[in-house]
């Protein structure tokens, strides 16, 4: 039997794709009576994403604090964007490697479902940038719903049925 979904985590990088995932999560939370947990993983905007979290500490403290406060305000605005929506919600900011922090947060808070955006990168872009969503799907203990921005092409032949020959080869 499936456990009830009472806590939904929505990680956000403040992209349009993450905002679409949040809208899905708000609808789910309303239908299920679940609480929303909006999470942003802070990283130094001047350091490449592949760097270790220790590099993030190199950002001058005043600039780092300003960036965190701006992120906190963005989270608050997204959570309270529509006063007619009736759901419980919290938001938080953590620092570190994005996918790892999302999974750890979900474990620590007893999250039942993660709803997150995915950019759907393929090929070289995927190899160079990796996929936070893919890592979360592979390592999270709870189910993960990935959401693409509307109009995103998923595959050049997505509207055609896939035959077993294509899957097997």
What positions do the PLM features span?
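Glycine-rich phosphate-binding loop signature in dinucleotide/nucleotide-binding domains
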Residues: 105-111
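Charged docking surfaces used in two-component/phosphorelay signaling
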Residues: 93-101
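Rossmann-fold cofactor-recognition segment
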Residues: 89-91
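Small/aliphatic-rich secondary-structure junction motif
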Residues: 2-58, 150-152, 161-169
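Glycine-rich, Arg-bearing micro-motifs that act as flexible, cationic patches
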Residues: 113-135, 153-156
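Short, structured coil segments at secondary-structure junctions
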Residues: 132, 140-141
């Amino acid at each position: 039997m499936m456990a009830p979904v009472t806590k939904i985590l929505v990680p956000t990088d403040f992209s349009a794709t993450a905002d679409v995932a949040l809208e899905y999560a708000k609808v789910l939370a309303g239908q299920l009576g679940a609480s929303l947990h909006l999470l942003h993983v802070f990283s130094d905007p001047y350091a490449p994403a592949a760097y270790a979290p220790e590099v993030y500490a190199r950002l001058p403290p005043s600039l780092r604090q300003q960036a965190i406060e701006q992120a906190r305000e963005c989270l608050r605005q997204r959570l309270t964007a529509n006063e007619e929506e009736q759901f419980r919600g919290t938001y938080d900011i953590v620092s570190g490697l994005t996918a790892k922090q999302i999974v750890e947060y979900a474990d620590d808070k007893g999250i039942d479902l993660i709803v997150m955006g995915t950019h759907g990168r393929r090929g070289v872009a995927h190899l160079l940038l990796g996929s936070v969503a893919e890592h979360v799907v592979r390592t999270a203990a709870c189910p993960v719903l990935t959401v693409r921005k509307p109009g995103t092409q998923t595959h050049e032949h997505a509207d055609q049925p896939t035959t077993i020959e294509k899957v097997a080869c």
